[in-house]
A protein has these predicted regions:
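Inter-heme linker and motif-flanking segments adjacent to c-type heme-binding CXXCH motifs
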Residues: 250
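A metal-dependent hydrolase metal-coordination microenvironment
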Residues: 97-238, 242, 273-276, 280-287, ...
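Charged catalytic cores and adjacent phosphate/nucleic-acid-binding surfaces used
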Residues: 1-103, 174-185, 253-440
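Extracellular glycoside hydrolase catalytic/binding regions
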Residues: 244-246
Length: 440
């Protein structure tokens, strides 16, 4: 439960801002002899006392200059005498203009339904993802684009606040590289299915034009991957190079030489730095992270995404009263909500999300259930991202959770549409309140 409303949470750097902290319950109200101190995390100045006052309704109003781009702690000390006091720490983040103009959106763009090798209906997955606090999602079934379109069409008028986009995982013939088509206007899988001869002819042309070829190397995989990247890009999608260090029993699924060439030629749009690996496969994500930073040291910077690659949102335990699964009470499955992307964008639309991922305005989040969150991207985005995971997204999720539950009930045949419609705009309103300049 959130004891206080604090707005705004994000403010412009190097400007005077007004922060309003309102206790939501009587037991959280400010009492005793109150004092207020502000501490910039980067120690750009010593701890100081800002201008502040308490309003009649108990709201604490703090006015201060928040320097540079960093987190700030507003400490409220209540002295009750006889050595008794209570301290509450509140945190905000000041941002330079370019990042202050963008909003954080949580999404997953690589997951599967029962239409390929997943377990659940794509419409149900959308409801579960909203329940988990996601702003956007794309279903990317193996070899099939149409299931994602069906999910988009089903929910678009019922819950327009949750942004659903088309997608697919592309498996071009004789190419082991897996590639996600996020947001493309049509299916790339259908292109090679409808005319495989044309696909092979165009791949051969790419091979012919590759420079400095060596005898005996697998240029088909490189060229076939670039054929897919180009088809996705031509149709407005984001071409994602997926899990290069996924390994099976006999070794890595894609050869290291192919990984080298694909990264060196850098024709894809985004790199899956964090993919859907189970705890016992931790080495794969570790290798992908190290490889990313090694490529950066060579002057090659890839936009990054984190994805769950989940094949189901629900798992079931065993009922102690009988032998078998308790199939009426599920819990979150492994991978679901473990790995995802935070995109800093002007709005949660496909052009804005794709455009900002390409500009490297994104973070990959690695946060398996019960474990610490690790973020990957630029230093600037990572430290802002940690603040958001702690101070922003939990409250957003509380609104999304209600929507997601109502979506599930609607899908199950219950008349929850009026209740769902009554919540429309709540998450957008919360997001803007977190950035809105407060008046004294």
């Amino acid at each position: 439960m959130f004891y206080f409303d604090l707005y705004p949470k994000m403010v412009p750097a190097d400007e005077i801002s007004v922060i309003r902290i309102r206790p939501r319950f009587s037991h959280a109200s400010f009492k005793g002899d109150v004092s207020v101190l502000v501490s910039p995390y980067d120690r750009t100045r010593p701890q100081f006392e800002p201008e502040w006052h308490l309003e009649e309704d108990g709201t604490l109003v703090v006015k201060a200059l928040f320097e540079s781009e960093q987190e700030h702690c507003i400490q409220v000390i209540e002295n009750f005498g006889e050595g008794k006091e209570r301290k509450n720490d509140f945190r905000i983040f000041s941002l330079f203009p370019d990042l202050y103009a963008l909003r954080p959106f949580k999404g997953d763009i690589h997951l599967h339904s029962k239409r390929s090798d997943g377990r659940e209906d794509g419409r149900y997955l959308a409801a579960r993802y909203r329940q988990a606090g996601f702003d956007f999602m794309a279903l990317t079934d193996h070899r099939y684009y149409e299931p994602s379109v069906e999910v988009v069409e089903y929910w678009k008028d019922i819950n327009p606040d949750f942004k659903l986009f088309p997608g697919e995982e592309v498996h071009a013939p004789d190419n082991p590289v897996h590639i996600v088509n996020f947001g493309g206007k049509c299916s790339v899988n259908n292109m090679y299915r409808e005319d495989e001869e044309k696909y092979r002819r165009e791949v051969a042309e790419i091979i012919e034009n590759l420079p400095d070829k060596e005898e005996g190397k697998d240029y088909f995989t490189v060229a076939a991957s670039e054929w897919v990247f180009k088809r996705i890009q031509e149709n407005g999608g984001l071409a994602v190079f997926c899990h290069p260090y996924w390994s099976i029993a006999t070794g890595n699924y894609v050869s290291e030489w192919n990984n080298d060439e694909i990264m060196k030629r850098n024709k894809f749009d985004a790199y899956e730095i964090i993919g859907g690996f189970f705890r016992w496969q931790y080495h794969s994500n570790n290798l992908q992270v190290v490889r990313y930073y090694e490529e950066m040291s060579k002057g090659r910077r890839f936009p990054v995404v984190g994805v769950s690659d989940s094949h189901g949102a629900d798992a079931f335990g065993f009922d102690a009263s009988r032998a078998g699964r308790n199939t009426n009470d599920s819990f979150d499955a492994d991978l679901f909500n473990w790995y995802y992307t935070i995109v800093f964008a002007e709005e949660c639309t496909l052009p804005s999300l794709i455009g900002n991922i390409k500009k490297c305005n994104s973070l990959a989040v690695n946060a398996p259930a019960g474990e610490r969150a690790e973020l990957y991207g630029s230093f600037r985005h990572v430290r802002y991202g940690h603040f958001l995971l702690r101070e922003y997204f939990p409250q957003l999720r509380s609104w999304c959770a209600v929507e997601g539950l109502l979506m599930q009930q609607y899908l199950a045949g219950e008349d929850t549409l009026p209740a769902l419609k009554s919540l429309m705009g709540k998450t957008d309103s919360y997001r803007e309140m977190c950035f809105k300049r407060s008046q004294e």
